[in-house]
């Protein structure tokens, strides 16, 4: 029997283009795909570059986002590239986590330098935890003055450093997406250089499997003669049988040991990220545990009630509220598998929030939830989603 061809598996990395409108994000996305197709035709598909700009509407968790996904490969890696052409779409996408980015290319037109949206996108990238940014100084073919190019590069580096991005190491590559699409060799090389920099500078994502174990609890039941079983889908990490774990959230933290692991009625020695499993926990009664708690590697996550967040409030057309809300608005915050009531305080100077708005807010929950920065949640009212956000800072 012929052996199947050995495929060297490449790291898979999610990246995106960010930056001010009309600085060339979409053109650069097209140029990257074309240049990589020409360089590695066996690794990449040819595509019609007009399709990237007419980004299809996607509905994620009821939120409409215009977004296009492009895939391409370098010798080293496989990339999934997200491009959200509209500013509002981009902001929604970042906040709702419709596309998690392992790194991003900040596109700044050399003719303009950093603009308002450039600053807003860099701030958001910091708040939602994009690990690495590098810079494409686009439209560089239109600036002949070397001093001007150097000044724009310095401004961009200052902006990155003001948001605590690593500015000394961050590559800044001068590109012309349009000229690269037209096949001009100098600028084709600029896009090749950019992708070499992306390969080198954006770190391999830490796979979920290598993080500390976490399983949101969906259900709890008793098996006569064996004890209490909690079920859920492991979100990250691996768990071996007889490991000590903590149950965190809603009540005081409890310690226990996992004495059995089951998946589809088969006994397993360990549970892995992405698997739906039942865990037998020692010494706990059915009433000691509830949906909405998480079962975790000890010490890896803590329970909190107060946090700051970045939130997108659904518009009326997306099935959201029809009316604005004000400070002291009470709603349900849906984290992982459960709703917890919370009270919202709006930032100073924000009187009210309209449907369709993006806002920052502080929240106080009535029960603690296992929380870390970057954690996503939905805001719900009477069972329907009215907002989507992520934790930017834990305050208590």
UniProtKB/Swiss-Prot annotation:
Positions of the UniProt region annotated as G4: 138-141
Question: Per its UniProt entry, which superkingdom is the organism in?
Answer: Bacteria
Where do the tr-type G domain residues begin and end? 10-206
What InterPro entries does the entry give?
Answer: EF-Tu_GTP-bd, EF-Tu_GTPase, EFTu-like_2, EFTU_2, G_TR_CS, P-loop_NTPase, Small_GTP-bd, T_Tr_GTP-bd_dom
- Coiled-coil spans in chain: none
Residues making up the signal peptide according to the UniProt record: none
Task: Quote the function comment for this protein.
Answer: GTP hydrolase that promotes the GTP-dependent binding of aminoacyl-tRNA to the A-site of ribosomes during protein biosynthesis.
Instruction: Please state what the protein is called.
Output: Elongation factor Tu
